[in-house]
Amino acid sequence: MDSRLPRLVFALLAIYAAIHFSSSYAQMPEVVASHFNAHGVPNGWQTKTAFFGVFVAMTVLSVVIGFGLSAIIGAVPIQLINLPNKQYWLSPEHRGATLEFLKSYFAWFSCSIYLVMIVFFDYAVQSNLHPESPPVASHLWYTLAAFLTFVFAWLIRMFARFGRPPRQNVGS
């Protein structure tokens, strides 16, 4: 698995977010609704500087999770790694392919987290820019359902990949 594509996707998402949110910054009130209940009604506020600061901090966190974690895994002693059948998957002959898979896999996970963040932050931005006709909160639930479906499929794929070592061809 090649990790260049998810890196490119993440970079494009970051560029989009930077352009999109920076164009909205000046139009936002100084104090913005930043937290909403399940029905989309605001119930928490903060300054717009703090609001966008949280977005930047969460962007950095998603980079660390998606791109830093796989680098850390490669440097950590094998006994500290929690991976099914790790003796096989992290043996010298399989370690490189395993780490490359994890690097790409966590990069895609980071992209999904970041996309969800963008959708949720955009909901808050649009709610502040158009308080008389805020966006429909159900879109957030659909986004959350799609993300949870992705995570479920992501975990299944992870366990399918590492759940057991491939069978050796006996007698060939």
Language-model features and meaning:
Residues 1-14, 55, 100-107:
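Alpha-helical transmembrane segments and their helix-start/interface "positive-inside/aromatic belt" motifs
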Residues 11-12, 47-69, 139-149:
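Alpha-helical transmembrane segments
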Residues 19, 108-129:
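Alpha-helical transmembrane segments and their membrane-interface junctions
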Residues 22-53:
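Active-site and channel-lining beta-strand-loop segments
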Residues 24, 64-86, 155-162:
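Membrane-water interface of transmembrane alpha-helices
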Residues 52, 99, 123, 127-172:
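Alpha-helical transmembrane segments and their immediate juxtamembrane interface regions
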Residues 76-97, 168-172:
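Juxtamembrane inter-helical linkers in multi-pass membrane proteins
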Residues 93-113:
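Loop-to-transmembrane boundary segments
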